[in-house]
Amino acid sequence: MSDVTHFSKVVAATASTLVSGDLSQSHVMRDISRPAFQKRIFSFSKRPSELVRITSSSKDVLLPDEMLVDIPSNENQFSLFQGFQATLPEHSVGSQLLLGDGSKVGEKSAREQLVEGKKSLSHKLDLLEVRKALAANEITEIDARVAHLQSMRQIVFDRVASLEQQEFQLESEVLRIDAELEQMEEEKEEVIQRHDYETRTPEELEDDVVDLKSVSEKLQSASQKTLPRRNLSRRKTQPTLQQYYEPGNKIRQIKAHSDSVTCLDFDIPFGTMVSAGMDLGLKVWDLSRGDLVTDLKGHNASVTCLQVDNNVLATGSADATIRVWNLDQVVSNPDAQDEGDDAYTIHVLDSHVGEISAIHFSDHTLVSGSADKTIRQWDLNTGRCVQTLDVIWANSAQNALYSNDRLRTGFDANAPFIGAVQCRDAALATGTADGIVRLWDLRSGQVQRTLQGHTAAVTCLQFDDVHLATGSRDRSVRIWDLRMGNIFDAFAYDSPITSLDFDNRRIASTNGENTVKIYDRAAEKHWSLGRGEGDPEAPESTVVKTKEGYLVEGGGDGVVGVWAC
């Protein structure tokens, strides 16, 4: 009996502890303290039964305030049961009448039928309202999820941008160290060669026939600045951030010049950009930050054309000179120019006697076109002109060409005589003021093929392995098949084409309007981007360059816009 007594005391103590505080119920405590309950405890081992009979109603069940704190507010005007009813399938009234007793229909008066019909329609209307509210709630939930995903995407997007910025910085440092190591190796070889020559005995000098002039030239060339090596495969990282922008979105805007932008180019997306303007400025920019690196000095007039190829910059100016710059030195030591204007200059090419209107270089060959009606080929290793191509037909047509402002063919006599050039290996393509595109062989200096179709001056061109794209003042862009020599595709805009750039996916061009024209080559679709899309009063776009879905355009107000395309 002592064990049973001990058990009853433990049960009573435990029960009093569990139901104490806010969760206590007075009638349960009264039942436990009654003698009848104690008697049932003693007989529990022989006749198991319910210790406490719950006789309380729902009105007696109370919830403490602590359990009601986190209940959300009911913003829905419909009950849970109404929502359940709205999800049940409907049965048409007509089918119910047909399935029921048809004799009862006639017994009802017309008024009763109308009242029942109204009730049925009202019920359906209520169900539709509930369903509409449920659908609206789903839309709200989806919008909230989309907003949350967008915020998460922005966080990851910023993380990718930060990682790419760190990659660019480390990559630039690696390339700078590689360039210094290569320079040290070259200097070491030069020292060894000088030492070997200076330590030769008089007998060795007498035995060998030495050309003093050639030795002097070698020593002089060794002391000159050399063209840095350009190898794109050296870059271990490639930018990808531009792929995550929607086409047509603005990435950045830079107030680059105080006057119209005449030309620009960049190496890679978010890399290094060089721009020139009518304000005589020639500036180097960090596209990842939008910061000015330095302002290059050297030309005595505005820069009319330029090209950036990895770590080399070539600029052509209205002062009839071409300058070749080392961009590695510009980026690594932007203050070196304070010591002199030639701190970054590799070569100054000054054989032309007229304004430089077009340049292009590939590997160690640079080709330039000038207002002096000549095309010159340069060796970038030595900085010397190795060939001059004279456009003979221009001399005979000069009087007719400039006798009035506009010819019968429709092109403007004020257009550059040589509007565009591009070279690759021994191939050269030129576009001139007569609207003809000529394909040259640099080995022979002869024209191999002419492409005729434009009716005004050719202002820009670019070719790859298969196609050549040309833009003209006749407002058209033509794509030529280099294998067959005929037109592959053509389209026109409302104004003369001023610049053009293309890749396998799209052709971007400017035509004096305030937007950049994009032609999707795969979808054969035209669309536009630029400040003019949202502002009809925006200034015109003067020049465009694009690479891998990353587009940079210069405006007539000196602003450079960076866009995703």
From Swiss-Prot:
One of its GO terms (biological process) is peroxisome fission. Residues 119-224 form a coiled coil. One of its GO terms (cellular component) is mitochondrial outer membrane. InterPro entries: G-protein_beta_WD-40_rep, WD40/YVTN_repeat-like_dom_sf, WD40_repeat_CS, WD40_repeat_dom_sf, WD40_rpt. It comes from the Eukaryota. Involved in mitochondrial fission. Acts as an adapter protein required to form mitochondrial fission complexes. Formation of these complexes is required to promote constriction and fission of the mitochondrial compartment at a late step in mitochondrial division. Belongs to the WD repeat MDV1/CAF4 family. This is Mitochondrial division protein 1. It comes from Yarrowia lipolytica (strain CLIB 122 / E 150).
